[in-house]
């Protein structure tokens, strides 16, 4: 009993000391040892208690001091995320430096700035950036392209493809003439996260697009069915076949009935020609000066004219360019499982009767699903709705989930501490306080406690012993003795050893007990049995 009590007290003291300790929270992690030393010195000067974990790179401070400690450390510039940025040019003197040193400092500064930017992303714990910047040569025809390698630490989870592409685009946009595919992204386990080629990147994007379409359609169908049947009454699975080809179509159409005069032009031409007739004879008129035929020839004349009209018509023409982006649904298959109707649980705890859905209800739900997904039988779409009995969740599990909802890790730990404290207090009551109270309510040292077969308020009666003396005995209502009065305290009793048992008893008490056993054997056996039962 003493050992159990001491153990309970020790546990209680340890628990009180643990609960009395101020809760701590993370200040910085994964620090460089030099920076960790500077931060701890600053915390000592500010009088802020701290605790280091791991190899010294993790610093914990009291929860109510986290904000002030971070502001103090940031104000002193003690933590630079382990990377050197453009501040390297603030301390170095450019005079006397060679071109190689200047280029190296420029590369280090660019790498440090990229590391800081990438580390600011959510989920990134550590990062290293290595840039390969080829030196430009005069009169070069094929310039070597720059490249980069980025190593990120993201813990136990795998970064998404969007994060990897964002890192590639960030690094390639920060370095002149660098392409995104020239940036290799690797995690802390040595796994390559960046796509090695455009084809694999396109395949990954296609798979993401397919998963996105299937999830969107499944959510739409499930929300619609659960809005009709109730929450948790539907399970939906969608398989979509997408056309991932990007098609550009250009079409020209001419309308002959829509012709319009564009331009008109008219050309008029005329000419006149006179000539002598050599076949005409000699006449008197030809010999008269100034008369007709004075030249001796007869003149013949001709006149020609030409009119040209040109009309240009513009025919109506329409040009249509159609671009079909990848992701068009070619075929879709939807599988829906719906639950039946379950009656409320009976008073004796038995589940209620289950009633499956009727064929008419299943047909109505199938029509709703076809309308929601844009069902097209010509392209081979399939929709199947089946009634299946769902397993009912346990009420206890739901209650536990509801109780834990809304509590963070600190609240759960605090509740666990209070629970342990309550258990320790209960153990103290059972093993320390209860025996103490029991001892207080026990008979006086001068009495021997006896147990009777029946209960009730005790009474006292005189019992004649073998030597003729009378002894007071405490009995219950049925007359069974439950206590034997001891001798007066003022008597001087002789003490003897019994079978070398450690401790001593009064000789007169032993004599009286022996006489009582001889006179009342049945009651004595009952008393011994009760003692044995209490000892076990």
Curated annotation (Swiss-Prot):
An annotated GO cellular component: bacterial-type flagellum basal body, MS ring
Positions of transmembrane segments: 1-21, 417-437
Pfam family of the protein (one): YscJ_FliF_C
Keywords carried by this UniProt record: Bacterial flagellum, Cell inner membrane, Cell membrane, Membrane, Transmembrane, Transmembrane helix
Any GO BP annotation: bacterial-type flagellum-dependent cell motility
Keyword set includes Transmembrane helix: yes
Location in or out of the cell: Cell inner membrane; Bacterial flagellum basal body
InterPro entries: AMP-bd_C_sf (IPR045851), Flag_M-ring_C (IPR013556), FlgMring_FliF (IPR000067), FliF_N_dom (IPR006182), YscJ/FliF (IPR043427)
Biased composition (Polar residues): 262-273
Keyword Hydrolase applies: no
Membrane topology term: Multi-pass membrane protein
Highest taxon above the source species: Bacteria
Stretch list, region Disordered: 247-300
GO function terms (MF aspect): cytoskeletal motor activity
Function: The M ring may be actively involved in energy transduction.
Family the entry assigns: Belongs to the FliF family.
Oligomeric and partner information: The basal body constitutes a major portion of the flagellar organelle and consists of five rings (E,L,P,S, and M) mounted on a central rod. The M ring is integral to the inner membrane of the cell and may be connected to the flagellar rod via the S ring. The S (supramembrane ring) lies just distal to the M ring. The L and P rings lie in the outer membrane and the periplasmic space, respectively.
Protein name: Flagellar M-ring protein
Gene: fliF
């Amino acid at each position: 009993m003493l050992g159990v009590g001491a153990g309970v007290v020790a546990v209680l003291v340890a628990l009180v000391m643990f609960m009395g300790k101020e809760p701590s929270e993370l200040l910085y992690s994964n620090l460089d040892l030099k920076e960790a030393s500077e931060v701890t010195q600053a915390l000592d000067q500010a009088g802020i208690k701290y605790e280091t974990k791991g190899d010294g790179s993790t610093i914990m401070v009291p929860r109510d001091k986290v904000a002030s400690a971070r502001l103090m450390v940031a104000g002193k510039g003690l933590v630079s995320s382990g990377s050197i940025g453009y501040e390297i040019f603030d301390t170095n003197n450019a005079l006397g430096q060679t071109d190689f040193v200047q280029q190296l400092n420029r590369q280090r500064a660019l790498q440090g700035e990229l590391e800081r930017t990438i580390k600011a992303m959510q989920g990134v714990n550590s990062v290293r950036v290595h840039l390969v910047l080829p030196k430009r040569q005069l009169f070069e025809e094929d310039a070597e392209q720059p490249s980069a390698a980025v190593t990120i630490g993201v813990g136990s989870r795998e970064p998404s493809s969007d994060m990897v592409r964002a890192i590639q685009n960030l690094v390639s946009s920060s370095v002149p003439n660098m392409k995104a595919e020239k940036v290799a992204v690797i995690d802390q386990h040595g796994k390559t996260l960046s796509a090695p080629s455009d084809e694999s990147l396109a395949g990954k994007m296609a798979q993401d697009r397919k998963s996105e379409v299937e999830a969107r359609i499944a959510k739409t169908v499930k929300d619609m069915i659960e809005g009709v049947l109730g929450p948790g009454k539907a399970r939906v699975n969608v398989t979509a076949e997408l056309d991932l080809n990007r098609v550009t179509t250009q079409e020209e159409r001419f309308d002959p009935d829509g012709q319009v005069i564009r331009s008109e032009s008219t050309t008029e031409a005329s000419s006149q020609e006179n000539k002598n007739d050599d076949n005409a004879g000699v006449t008197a008129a030809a010999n008269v000066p100034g008369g007709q035929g004075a030249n001796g020839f007869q003149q013949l004349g001709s006149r020609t004219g030409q009119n040209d009209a040109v009309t240009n018509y513009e025919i109506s023409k329409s040009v249509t360019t159609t671009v079909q982006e990848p992701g068009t649904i070619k075929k879709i298959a939807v599988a829906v499982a719906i639950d039946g109707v379950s009656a409320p649980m009976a008073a004796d705890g038995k589940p209620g009767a289950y009633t499956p859905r009727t064929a008419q209800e299943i047909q109505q739900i199938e029509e709703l699903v076809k309308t929601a997904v844009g069902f097209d039988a010509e392209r081979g779409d399939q929709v199947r709705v089946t009634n299946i009995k769902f397993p009912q969740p346990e009420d206890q599990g739901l209650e536990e989930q509801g109780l834990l909802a809304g509590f963070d890790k600190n609240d759960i730990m605090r509740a666990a501490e209070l629970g342990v404290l309550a258990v320790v207090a209960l153990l103290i009551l059972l093993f320390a306080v209860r025996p103490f109270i029991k001892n207080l309510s026990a008979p006086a040292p001068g009495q021997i406690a006896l147990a009777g077969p029946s209960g009730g308020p005790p009474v006292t009666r005189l019992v004649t012993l073998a030597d003729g003396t009378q002894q007071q005995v405490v009995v219950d209502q049925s007359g069974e003795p439950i206590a034997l009065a001891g001798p007066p305290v003022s008597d001087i009793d002789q003490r003897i050893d019994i079978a070398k048992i450690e401790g001593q008893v009064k000789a007169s008490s032993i004599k009286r007990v022996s006489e009582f056993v001889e006179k009342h054997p049945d009651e004595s056996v009952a008393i011994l049995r009760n003692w044995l039962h209490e000892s076990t």
